[in-house]
Amino acid sequence: MHVTLVEINVKEDKVDQFIEVFRANHLGSIREAGNLRFDVLRDEHIPTRFYIYEAYTDEAAVAIHKTTPHYLQCVEQLAPLMTGPRKKTVFIGLMP
């Protein structure tokens, strides 16, 4: 299992727009054959910080995900909403 935790920091006045943009990516991602989880989380103490917990069957499924229209559109639309680049940490899932 291939797991990625993505941290996204959003401009304060762009939070609602971020949620709408990411909703389309979420809905598309959970329908992908290789997707196991795609959770969108909001930091309890920093309301402009979001985490995306993505679990895929393997790296090939991740590669396919990164070619999907919902992913490509999301990445394009996120750029003006963020305060800086996304931060990614990759894990090997052992016990889901």
Swiss-Prot record:
It is found in: Cytoplasm. It is an enzyme of class 5 (isomerase). Signal peptide: none annotated. InterPro entries: ABM_dom, AI-2_Isomerase_LsrG, Dimeric_a/b-barrel, LsrG. Residues 2-91 form the ABM domain. The keyword Isomerase applies. GO terms for molecular function: (4S)-4-hydroxy-5-phosphonooxypentane-2,3-dione isomerase activity; oxidoreductase activity. The keyword Cytoplasm applies. Keywords: Cytoplasm, Isomerase. It holds the Pfam family ABM. Transmembrane segments: none annotated. Its EC number is 5.3.1.32. GO terms for cellular component: cytosol. Belongs to the LsrG family. Involved in the degradation of phospho-AI-2, thereby terminating induction of the lsr operon and closing the AI-2 signaling cycle. Catalyzes the conversion of (4S)-4-hydroxy-5-phosphonooxypentane-2,3-dione (P-DPD) to 3-hydroxy-5-phosphonooxypentane-2,4-dione (P-HPD). Homodimer. This is (4S)-4-hydroxy-5-phosphonooxypentane-2,3-dione isomerase. It comes from Yersinia pestis. The lineage of its organism: Bacteria, Pseudomonadati, Pseudomonadota, Gammaproteobacteria, Enterobacterales. The gene is lsrG.
